[in-house]
Amino acid sequence: MTDWTSGYVADIGYIFGYYLELNPQRVKLAFLNASLVAPEFGTACELGFGQGLSANLHAAASVCSWHGTDFNPSQAGFAQELATVSGANAHLYDEAFDEFAKRDLPEFDYIGLHGIWSWISDENRAVIVNFIRKKLKVGGVLYISYNTLPGWGTFAPMRHLMTKHAEVIGADGVGIVSRIDGALDFTEKLLATKPLFSRANPLINEKIKQIKDQNRHYLAHEYFNRDWHPMHFATMAQWLEPAKLTYACSAHYLDSVEAVNLTPEQQAFLKDIHDPMFKQTVRDFMVNQQFRRDYWVKGARRLTPLEQALSLREQRFMMTAHRPDVSLKVTGSLGEATLTEKVYAPVLDLMADHKTRSLEQIEQAVKDAGISFAQLIQTVLVLCGNGTLSSVQDEATISKAKKHADKLNTHLMLKARSNNDLTFLASPVTGGGVALGRFHQLFALAIQQGKKKPEDWAAFVEQILASQGQKIVKEGKPLETSEQQLAELTSQAHEFAIKQLPALQALKIV
């Protein structure tokens, strides 16, 4: 009998996650910062899309034609449901990579893989590389994220032990969640004996504690597949060489801000390394990199300084956060750093009204603050990297995408009546997903249904909870009466009206 799972965990679904780096709209800022030409994105593909939330949000929030596959039929079925509801140009399948590659597919401007590279066999990696070689256009971009060495070097033996316990000791027929719990309990008991391994690697105990608190669906796919291969950057480069790809830049904007990631001594050391690929490998040792999120390009083309500056000034942004809640702290590999208030505050104050502005308009508006263009670029990178600002699509794209985003968002908000699994909605303004918890989605649904006041939104949500016997948990205790629930929801609704609603309206979600 053929094992259609190829050693991949398939008896438990993956989490309903959204990964903003998969949004092609984010490529342009990263590429321009790296002085690279970015393509216009008309066709895109996601390989191993999981539950398909990212693929569907990106298809509904843009005019890009999306294709993708995930071999798990239950996950693909859910993804197809969302695509049907939105009516967006999304073609999602439940096929293995080699089957999918045989389809009559277009050439793609963009191909994305989030995480799966680390969890599949070398055979499947070869299939993916061949697919990229054939289907990624010249000038096209690959986004790929993967577990990285040396950061995973210490924990890899412990992961091997946990999976062996689940395989050898875990009882057949009890399911992967029980086997994971058993493996974690066993690991804790082992560490309690103070083995020399944990003395040599003192951070292992804390790592196991962190893992115990994580979603079991996530752990099943992150740690308990048959194949699990963290990889050095240089090894990844060797894999992608047959597809004619070269490294472009990190998809994680904060990686480009060296001051929060590397000491002055480390920055000076890296400057003496002239090979860009080897430089990345060395940098991974400096930051003990565990997970890379990278853009690769088929045929990199460099911009002149003038072309770079002109293109950057054309980029449009808006603030998606509530200004009083924005922190001037940022976390990099070196830990927490404080942002320079005299540089960041003028930009934040200007953008607090959630209006869309080009970088040129921002530059002109804050010119009296003495902020240089280089400082402004870094400010925007940091604020986009921490979710305070977002890139904005052109008006024609926003207009075309809105009807599909509206349909998908209504469907997701209706699902929020019964559970909190899906915590993102689509914005035609940013071309991607926006995080929004269950109650906030239900407040937005109440507004969509014509309710005007926070008190009305709260009553709407309280009725939904009461009909299902659901209670709000506050400070660890359930609220017992409907009056208590309504009071809590009313308080949350008033806060929502002040903190979230203005941004959601600017994002054209509400």
Regions found by a protein language model. Name each.
Residues I398-Q449:
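Short, amphipathic alpha-helical interaction segments positioned at domain boundaries
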Residues G139-N147:
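Conserved beta-strand signature within the Rossmann-like core of class I S-adenosyl-L-methionine
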Residues G7-G42:
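Conserved alpha-helix/loop element of class I SAM-dependent methyltransferases that forms part
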